[in-house]
Amino acid sequence: GTNTDFDGNFSIQDASSGDVLVFSYLGYKTQEITIGDASAFDVFLVEDAEALDEVIVLGYVSQKAANISGSVSTVSEEQVQSLKPVRMEDALQGLPGVNMFSNGAPGAKPTVIIRGVTSYTGNAPLVIVDGITLSLDDMNALDPSDIESISVLKDASTTALYGVRGGNGVIVITTKSGNRNQDAKFSFNTSYGQQSPEKTIGVLNATEYAAILNEMSVSSGGALIYPDISNLGKGTDWQKEIFRIDAPLVSHSISASGGSEKTSYYVSAGFTGQEGLIYGKDKQFFNRSTFRANFNTDLSSKLKLIVNNRFSNLKDSGLGDIIFNALNMSPTTPVFADDGSYAISNTITQEIKNPMAQISNSYGEGNTNTISGKIELQYDLLKDLKVNSRLGYTYVNIHGKGFTPYQFYGVGHNATNANSDLSPISNTDADGNVTQTWNSVSENKDHHFSYTYDLNASYKFSMDQHNFNVFAGFQIGKNSGGSVSGSKVGVPFNSWDYADLSSATGPDDEQRSGSWQYVSRRVSLMARAEYDYNEKYLASFTIRRDGSTSFGQNNKFGYFP
């Protein structure tokens, strides 16, 4: 996506005839133009009266679109459902001012940049889900079927209320809730698709590759490496060998919603499964299972209780630099040698691997459980004075395991840890001490817990055509967590089935272990005042004071207007 400049001019790269340009702006009707032979367009957007009256969720506050003075982009429930993204960030693709980059692996976390490169220590935006502060990592645990709306806050006017943590932009997500006075409504959605590479990278074939190596060798005074290149042909297309054209992507979700005069509910469960584009479906996949229960009820005519809870389980497995090796492996090398083992290159001996052998030798898995939710009380103290008290929490438990088997990529190769028959390599030093190579298994268990407590109040009032909306709040929070990890050698039968710390039988002096833990606390005060005159002239003023144990010793507090 792109933005216009101050005068409304814009340019976009890599657009081809037949592509569709989508022009949108908050409060205006979206317009689509199909690219033909023209290279310049005059685009006029028409005001959308309904869109101007739409209420946009900005996190702590909500405003009519017509009264927002800052920069905000929105994604509706209908847009999310039509896109059917695996990760919620994918639904932001193409929004003005939002740049995204991903490596394409199943469930992979993309890089999302909203306000450009703003920090040496990271540019990930802050994520708010139903008022709960999360990070970009947590978006992987959300089921797109549960999403009601997404707002992306992009400038200082809209993000200042979040202080220093909003400096990279803020993504505000609201999940679905049931409607009151509605009978139970059940919904089931399922989808199936297949993924394939859109294009591959052009590389040398075997004949071209051999000719260049011959020229290089002769120019340095050596002999021809390939005396007869006429019989080589195109050789091995390694990208064709590693990529699939039918990688499945499935999604299922079921929900129930409804409510009575004073109560509403929304309950859902979902599953998403994605296999990678690289062969070996058990080596590269992403599976997500979710359960959500949102509930709100009137405890009295002035007091409302809201309870949201969700659980998610993520299972994933990934591969390393397979594509790198496919692009750099010699096309003169076949996939398999004459004896049925994976072939090795005679010209690349230290770093590049046969990518099919690398897939076969790659083992790893991750399992992540997340519980997150909030308990919120909303009290109407006066007609236009509302007080909110909210406790949000998130607990994450992660278990990861990896296995490095005995593997042979050629004598002297950096990754070789076994002989060609996959037996250990033994060495004897001058004193007669014998050492050998080992296969190994590693495991880690991480846990993270965070909570935030918010107490805030908002007051709306008007005097003639002067309209005011005042907000003030207090927040405290804590993040804590830790990890233990270990590795051992000597996995029985050189098998993933026996890759476990308790099963490894190698010597104790080859055993490794480690641990870490962290804790941080923060406290914040914030205030915001919004003013409009007859909904034509707008102004907003925001200030926040943050204190954090993560700040420098002499700067524990700071103001962020």
Give residue spans per PLM region.
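Short acidic/polar hinge/loop motifs at secondary-structure boundaries
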Residues: F10-D14, Q79, K84, D130-T158
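Surface-exposed loop/interface segments of Gram-negative outer-membrane beta-barrel transport/assembly proteins
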Residues: R180-T236, T272, L277-S372, R390, ...
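Non-catalytic regulatory/gating segments with a bias toward low-complexity or hydrophobic composition
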Residues: L92, G131, I150-S151, I171-I173
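Outer-membrane beta-barrel channels and translocator barrels
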Residues: P85, L249, S260-E261, N296, ...
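Repeated loop/turn-to-beta-strand initiation elements of outer-membrane beta-barrel proteins
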Residues: K262-Y265, K302-L305, D384-V387, Q465-F468, ...
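N-terminal periplasmic "start-of-domain" segments of outer-membrane beta-barrel proteins
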Residues: G1-N9, I56-Q81, A108-T111, P125-L126, ...
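Periplasm-facing N-terminal accessory domains of Gram-negative outer-membrane beta-barrel systems
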Residues: G1-E54
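Residues embedded in well-ordered regular secondary structure
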Residues: T74, Q81-P85, G94-F101, A105-I113, ...
